Structure formats: structure tokens, C-alpha cells
Amino acid sequence: MKLLRRAWRRRAALGLGTLALCGAALLYLARCAAEPGDPRAMSGRSPPPPAPARAAAFLAVLVASAPRAAERRSVIRSTWLARRGAPGDVWARFAVGTAGLGAEERRALEREQARHGDLLLLPALRDAYENLTAKVLAMLAWLDEHVAFEFVLKADDDSFARLDALLAELRAREPARRRRLYWGFFSGRGRVKPGGRWREAAWQLCDYYLPYALGGGYVLSADLVHYLRLSRDYLRAWHSEDVSLGAWLAPVDVQREHDPRFDTEYRSRGCSNQYLVTHKQSLEDMLEKHATLAREGRLCKREVQLRLSYVYDWSAPPSQCCQRREGIP
């Protein structure tokens, strides 16, 4: 009799254990059946909202601007940025550092942003010349993270750009010539500045700057911008942003294209109807060029050359690259 009771107790315990094991298995299968995004798999929480869609354009335009340069930005909006082609052709922002600004300056920028929505505000950056290299790198890194684009034009807020001509030239390129593009007006014989505003005390590479496209305006392909963002923590920043960019891209397999139609030196060479970008423009210059384009389909009311230009000789040493001659725009 005792043996029967023991056998019964063992059978009951075994049955209860089997039921518990089956229940656990069913619970596990039910949890696995819920999709990762299903609220049942998230302890009753609602699923996270979808990530916002990235802006997209063929050509991005980043204009480095100062907090108090609202009038310049207004003129650019109404002149060369107004000629941006079809939807999806051009995406543009004015980049402004806001660290250290007073309350009134911040409010003015907030009002401008509310009205136009085209400011790229950089709260971690104090807008000053000595921070220009960090600013340009921050602009490019932000662009790579937030916008789908093929090319970017970096310009200053005293530059005038022919977006229609730039778009046409870039679209006409063969696929192989759209990769690793660094396009502008190059210098290879720039002597290292020992003093003044452009002093580069930390430059130790050689007695000349490495070949670089002058900063009044240049074009980069998206793959180079992506490379710069991924490398940003390892890049040495010098005072001049264009000199820094030339050094950063020096060891990279890029297509450096010197183009005299980029009038982007520290002083304008004049006015040519061939120019794609013209630096050192007053507000009156911009308004006149825009009006002449609208009225006559050409950039200049009257073509004039104030300084000679050059074609970069890539076969010569950098110090002998750039001989100015007649007949070059």
C-alpha cells in the first residue's frame, strides 16, 4: 500500500512538472511571435516614431556667414540663391556659430530662422575668424549626417555664385568624374604667413602651403565630405580653412581640378561672363550681377580684368605651379 502511495506521488509530481515546462515553453513562443516593433514586445510602450526623412538635393550650398550679417544673407537670398533651378536641384543653408552671443543677437537669429528656415545654427561654436576652420568642418560634418547630396558648394557670404552654370557642369560629368572631386581655384605656392591675421605658427609641414582651393568658393563631392566627417577627430586645424582642407586632402586620392572661372582669391580679378564664383563682392555688386543676368543673360555689365590669372601646372613643382598670363579669365 505504501509503495502505491509513493508511486502515485511521483506520478503527480512528474505531471505537474511537465505542465509547468509546457507553460513556460508556450510563454516563450508567444513572446518570440511578437515583432520587435510590436507594442506587445515593448511592455505596453508605443513604438518609437520613425526617423525624419533626410533632405535631398543634387547640389548642397553652405554659406559661411557671421551672426550680424543679416543684410548680406538677405541680398544673397534675393539674388544668386534665388536662381536654384527645379525642386531637388539645390539645398542651401547659411552657417552661423551662436556660442557666446548676447540675448538680442540670439533673438534676431531666431526671428530670421522663423521667417526663412535656412540658417544652420552651430551652438557649440563661437563665430570668429580663429574658429573658421572648426566652423567649416562642423558645417560639412552636419551636412553629411543630415542631407543626401552629390556635391556641395562652400562659399563665403561675400561671394556670388552662378548656380545654374554649376548645376549644368556637374550634371554633364561622367560618373567617374563625379567621385572624389575637389574643384576650385588652386594655389600651390602660398608662402606660410609668419604674422598678421593669417599667421600659421603651428604649420610645420614645409615652407609652402600644400596645394589648396581658395576659400571664396569651392566644390566637393559627397564622398570626400563623408571622409572628412569620419576623420574629423584626427584632423589638425590651422587658422585658414582653405589651407587646412588642402592639407587634409593631400594624402587622399582625389581629383583636384583647378578652374580659372572660380574668382575666389583674396581680391577679385574683375568680372568675366565665364566666372562661376566671384569673391569679395559688395551688396551692390551682387545686386548688379543679378540684374544683369536677369535682363541680359550674362554676368557682367562690362567685362573687366583687374589682375592676371593662371592655369595650374600640375607637372611642375608646387612653387612653380602658377604663372599669371594674359588671356586667362
Curated annotation (Swiss-Prot):
It is found in: Golgi apparatus, Golgi stack membrane. This is Beta-1,3-galactosyltransferase 6. Changing P67L: In SEMDJL1; loss of galactosylxylosylprotein 3-beta-galactosyltransferase activity; decreased localization to the Golgi apparatus. It is an enzyme of class 2 (transferase). Glycans are attached at N131. It comes from the Eukaryota. Residues 35-329 are lumenal. It comes from Homo sapiens.
